[in-house]
């Protein structure tokens, strides 16, 4: 247990007054770990001068009685003390032992209450700051928040940015800054009847939330930016896990057609449809910016470039089109495929497209130039991954192929599936490829191994085709048309959890935070799972038309928002995109 504010010190350490204990009004986190206000006017940066300096320690405890009791000291006790002083150290210890043995428990408890505080030292203030930091480096973020409540000295040390960097706060910097999307822009796009969002924040509370959203950067951010990032990321994760959903909106478009593809980049959402168009939406305003018209067939695949300047689309009209995100203008029409363009992947300005014509093509989207054609598959190319150098493709010919994008040469053909390959995942740093097939299996490959030995794991358990996969470390999560989500350890080749709850094919998968996965399904629901525990956290969206044709076609997300493409193939549910907000401000 960390020392609290009732700690008493001798002359060699801080008194309770020196400690300046943090009051209830000062606390940033209460005992339940929830945020509270802090308003002591602390400095915006760490100041070593504010820390109490180290002082020499006393070797004797000051246990003298109060003045009033000194006047009434029993002469017999004075005589006993005089005798005690003449004893050697060993004899004094023997005397203590005998006295304790002869004492009753009431006296022993009183003696303990007098002695114990002298052993509760404020060690952080006595140590050099560097040693104090080294100790705090071993604590969790939650423990550091508790440390900050002990005293102002401890608070100053615990807010040094280097300590919070050791917790990996750098990864939290990818969270976009808080937005104003629920301060009014989403009010006119209310969720329609027939859609249930459990735990949605109540309208009366939403006004308070809107006010808080205007205060994007709080006092802690000014004082300790990395601590503030940690607290914000923790709040965002709690918003996903359990807190009421802070805001929601509906983007209506594409009439009664199917939304076939969807991507998010910063504040831009792009949807493609079998109505031959794409729509570019401003998320924060909740409105369409452009409708991209030009394809003469349904749009089946699209991408937003990493720089955010280009939107690329592939269609059943056999063309690839490059559009400007800035003004929605058509920049290039890339021709060459002789059948539907079914899949694509981008790295920088280089695009790779896969087609039912059995080929892949490599393009430069900035210039519109065709760079290479990759021949080798004997049936339609269904999925592709690209890291800027290596292309990985999966086809209806049951194979996975590895290509050099610069030379157009096939480096390796991975065989083992006995039906069509529908999904791929490629982690270039470890040369790992995961492939999902209509043969119900998932294979994990290391294409740097000798030919014929590339398959390092065969994951079996699903009973239909795998529609999506995500990998972190050795943990792979897969969603399948059999209505189940499975969590795998690819190193061991075993299924860790099977997540059951959907009543129809799972259409999409998104991984959030440390251990949360969201899945959408043809049953009209979006579910959030804890893959570490193998348990359902909660339903995020439920369509009343689910089970009668209403479905969630796909998901895409940022760390603070989820977009759900909704509709039906029998007109039981209007086509739309539902946006859910899980954002939090910097405290």
UniProtKB/Swiss-Prot annotation:
WD repeat placement: 253-291, 294-333, 336-373, 376-415, 416-455, 461-498, 501-539
Lineage per the UniProt record: Eukaryota, Metazoa, Ecdysozoa, Nematoda, Chromadorea
UniProt GO MF annotations: protein homodimerization activity; protein kinase binding
InterPro entries: F-box-like_dom_sf (IPR036047), F-box_dom (IPR001810), G-protein_beta_WD-40_rep (IPR020472), WD40/YVTN_repeat-like_dom_sf (IPR015943), WD40_repeat_CS (IPR019775), WD40_repeat_dom_sf (IPR036322), WD40_rpt (IPR001680)
Subunit field text: Probable component of the SCF(sel-10) E3 ubiquitin-protein ligase complex which includes skr-1 and F-box domain-containing protein sel-10 as a substrate recognition component. Interacts with fem-1, fem-2, and fem-3. Interacts with the intracellular domain of glp-1 and sel-12. Interacts with lin-12. Interacts with skr-1. Interacts with zyg-1.
Domain (F-box) ranges: 121-167
The name this protein goes by in its record: F-box/WD repeat-containing protein sel-10
Location(s) in or outside the cell: Cell projection, Axon; Cytoplasm
Keyword Secreted listed: no
Bias (Low complexity) ranges: 35-47
Disordered as annotated region, ranges: 1-53
Start-end of Basic and acidic residues biased regions: 1-11
Annotated keywords: Cell projection, Cytoplasm, Developmental protein, Differentiation, Repeat, Sexual differentiation, Ubl conjugation pathway, WD repeat
Entry-linked PROSITE patterns: FBOX, WD_REPEATS_1, WD_REPEATS_2, WD_REPEATS_REGION
Gene Ontology CC, one term: cytoplasm
Tissue-by-tissue expression: Expressed in tail and head neurons.
